């Protein structure tokens, strides 16, 4: 659900544009009731009354299809097969934050700790919390170490990539030959931009079967992770993520099984995921977004007063000749 203040603000708009069908469903489906304190009867209802339209976040296909920079640091990784996670590590206990970052690490370690050390894949964590400071980096590192500590020497490799990367650097990360698949246990996305960008690699994506990313991740080309809708935990709640809300929690056993299958049968999953690239190039590019935006503006601009240009008189035209008057 969305906060009531958000509803009040939205109703001051003429048109509300959101990035996904999921976001639209949440916005139009949220309502607050005002009841008579004595009778308990509903006397008023607050919900969005203005039109809500969906406009996806188009991907720059020129940058994310053809990276012009190389992240040479990744060449040094000991593991040739690596899962990639991209997202903020926000507030919340392990298993309760919005991106479910801690459980991505724990599930990965649980699955691959049984393989011989030279056969284990790695996990690249492109993550941070509030910023990109040294303090933030060390805090993230401590969180990762805390999750891996119980696994001891059996823990597979987890790499932290911390810092602000440009679009070209992110594209280089996605396309690097040592990045084999992307994984996300997200509890809820308005859109899921890193997932959209990664589709242009044509590599496998494992992602929660819920929320905004479903718009551009066709089931036939994606490894969708099962789960269920659960309550927001107190440790993750704030003024935007309300305690009264619900979101998605991945079935970790299902996720573990599918992560292993992608690793163990990679070539078949690579064939399956090739359609992700075609789908984004055809339906979710910046150019396609522009087309949809123009259609939307044409639809809602009808009846809106148009600017009328002010036309100055042509001063170069022949001046009118006035008659000459005789002096008296």
Language model segments and positions:
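Short hydrophobic beta-strand element within catalytic cores of glycosyltransferases
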Residues: 204-207, 223-224
């Amino acid at each position: 659900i969305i906060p009531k203040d958000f509803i009040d603000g939205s109703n001051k708009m003429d048109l509300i544009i959101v990035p996904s069908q999921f976001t639209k469903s949440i916005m139009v489906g949220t309502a607050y009731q005002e009841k008579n304190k004595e009778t308990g009867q509903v006397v008023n209802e607050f919900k969005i009354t203005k039109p809500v339209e969906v406009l996806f976040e188009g991907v720059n296909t020129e940058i994310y299809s053809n990276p012009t920079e190389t992240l040479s640091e990744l060449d040094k990784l000991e593991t040739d097969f690596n899962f990639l996670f991209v997202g903020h590590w926000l507030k919340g206990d392990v298993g309760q934050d919005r991106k479910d970052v801690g459980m991505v690490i724990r599930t990965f370690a649980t699955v691959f700790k049984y393989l011989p050390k030279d056969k284990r894949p790695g996990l690249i964590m492109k993550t941070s919390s509030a910023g990109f400071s040294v303090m933030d980096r060390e805090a993230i590192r401590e969180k990762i170490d805390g999750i891996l500590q119980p696994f001891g020497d059996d823990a597979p490799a987890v790499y932290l990539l911390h810092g602000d990367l440009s679009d070209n650097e992110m594209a280089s990360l996605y396309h690097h030959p040592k990045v084999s698949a992307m994984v996300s246990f997200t509890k809820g996305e308005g859109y899921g931009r890193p997932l959209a960008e990664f589709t242009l690699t044509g590599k496998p994506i494992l992602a929660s079967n819920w929320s905004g990313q479903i718009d551009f991740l066709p089931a036939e080309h994606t490894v969708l992770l099962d789960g269920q809708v659960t309550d927001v935990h107190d440790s993750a709640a704030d003024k935007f993520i309300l305690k009264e809300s619900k979101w998605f929690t991945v079935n970790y056993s299902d996720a573990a099984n599918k992560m292993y299958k992608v690793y163990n049968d990679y070539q078949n999953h690579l064939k399956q995921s090739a359609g992700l690239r075609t789908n984004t190039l055809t339906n979710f590019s910046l150019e396609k977004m522009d087309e949809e935006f123009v259609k939307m503006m044409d639809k809602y601009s009808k009846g809106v007063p148009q600017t009328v240009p002010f036309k100055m008189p042509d001063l170069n035209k022949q001046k009118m000749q006035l008659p000459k008057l005789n002096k008296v």
